[in-house]
């Protein structure tokens, strides 16, 4: 199936069938979907980071973004559906937000079985902000000489290298400056601030 890239809308198909065979026709369903950030990784590229650029004003990953964003955003809430004669149905998730990183759409369909019990089935669809996924590998995450070596690669959403893809790498230097202040009673406190310098284009090709 086609991998969704920067979709504004996402159509999902449903098929409800009896265990003995044949579709469950004219059955009422309820569709719910959750959009949540996903960690991009590919076999053979474990040393590369595929994370989007961080906000330079944020000191660590735990502070970046709202915790509710990590838990997910409800993009479809108990939409009423009905299967056709063959047990098929479909629904479309509209107005998806602009993506800055890979996300998963967790879709759930609820229905009543012949015994009246509520049953739920689910599927997960990976959606991407771009058809090109950039990865960055640093030779080391610490440097004592003011220099850092890194490798950049471009993959498609299935993890295959893209030949001839133009890439531009920009850099930022973030420095945390701590100032010690003497408090009442002889105690000390530290005031930390982060200064960010734009290094511009580091390389392109």
Q: Language-model segments: which ranges?
A:
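A structural signal for beta-strand and strand-to-loop patches characteristic of beta-rich domains
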Residues: 1-205
């Amino acid at each position: 199936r086609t991998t969704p890239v920067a979709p504004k809308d996402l159509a999902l198909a449903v098929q409800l069938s009896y265990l003995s065979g044949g579709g469950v026709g004219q059955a009422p369903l309820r569709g719910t979907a959750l959009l949540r950030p996903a960690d991009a990784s590919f076999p053979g590229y474990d040393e590369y980071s595929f994370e989007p650029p961080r906000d330079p004003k944020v000191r660590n990953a735990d502070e970046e973004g709202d915790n509710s964003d990590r838990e997910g955003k409800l993009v479809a809430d108990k939409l009423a559906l009905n299967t056709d004669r063959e047990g098929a149905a479909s629904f479309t998730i509209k107005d998806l937000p602009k993506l800055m990183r890979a996300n998963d759409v967790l879709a759930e369909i609820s229905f009543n079985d012949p015994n009246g019990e509520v049953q739920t089935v689910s599927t997960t669809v990976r959606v991407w902000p771009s058809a090109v996924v950039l990865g960055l590998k640093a030779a080391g995450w610490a440097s004592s000489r003011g220099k850092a070596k890194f490798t950049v690669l471009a993959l498609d959403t299935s993890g295959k290298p893209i030949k001839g893809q133009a890439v531009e790498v920009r850099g930022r230097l973030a420095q945390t400056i701590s100032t010690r202040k003497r408090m009442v009673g002889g105690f000390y406190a530290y005031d930390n601030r982060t200064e960010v310098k734009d290094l511009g284009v580091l390389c392109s090709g």
